[in-house]
A protein has these predicted regions:
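Nucleotide/pyrophosphate-binding catalytic subdomain
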Residues: 1-188
Length: 188
């Protein structure tokens, strides 16, 4: 019902929804998700997907453990994984005739007014062309000091910049917490 009243919808996908702990890509889940996106587009909705998964898919390709990566290596792995991520989306969404684009953002891109306005213009033009932007943090150049750290925050900022009516966060976390419950056991 709420989606019926929304014109622009931002959907954030956590990497665990795309690839499981055993590094197996969840193709069936992504295929079902693409059907939902197609339905939204058929109903004249503008959709932005904020997707995690570049580092996880890079680790899969290189057979690495994500937890052992230092920043410089994780930046390289993200660069490798970003192509894998976009290929995964392209293969899945092409069968539904959904046009995709890619936007990689840093914290500065969303916090500096001129850059945020440019991002807004890009989103608006992609909507006019009936493309679905897939947004991710530009992990290959982001450093600890200028990094979002998780795509929930990035998705929130993308929703603000794009003027979205609705933000949907899809993850394997049960509910909304004050902190990451996997790291902070006192999270509420």
């Amino acid at each position: 019902m709420y989606l019926n009243n929304s014109k622009t919808i931002v959907i954030k996908i956590g990497s665990s929804l795309l690839i499981n702990d055993r590094k197996i890509v969840r193709k069936k889940w992504l295929s079902e998700f693409s059907k939902d996106i197609k339905e939204l587009l058929d109903n004249k909705k503008n959709v932005i997907i904020v997707s995690s998964g570049a580092i996880a898919l890079g680790c899969k390709k290189l057979n690495l453990n994500k937890k052992s990566l230092k920043l410089d290596k994780s930046q390289a792995v993200a660069s490798i994984g970003q192509i894998e991520l976009m290929n995964l989306y392209k293969k899945t969404f092409n069968s539904k005739k959904i046009n995709l684009s890619q936007i990689l953002l840093t914290l500065e891109d969303t916090e500096k007014r001129r850059r945020a306005i440019n991002a807004k213009r890009t989103f608006d033009n992609l909507f006019k062309l009936r493309f679905v932007p897939i947004v991710n943090e530009n992990d290959s150049i982001a450093t600890t000091e200028i990094k979002y750290g998780d795509n929930d925050r990035l998705a929130s900022r993308v929703a603000q910049i794009s003027g979205a009516d609705c933000l949907i966060l899809l993850s394997d976390v049960d509910g909304l917490y004050t902190q990451n419950p996997k790291i902070y056991h006192d999270a509420k």
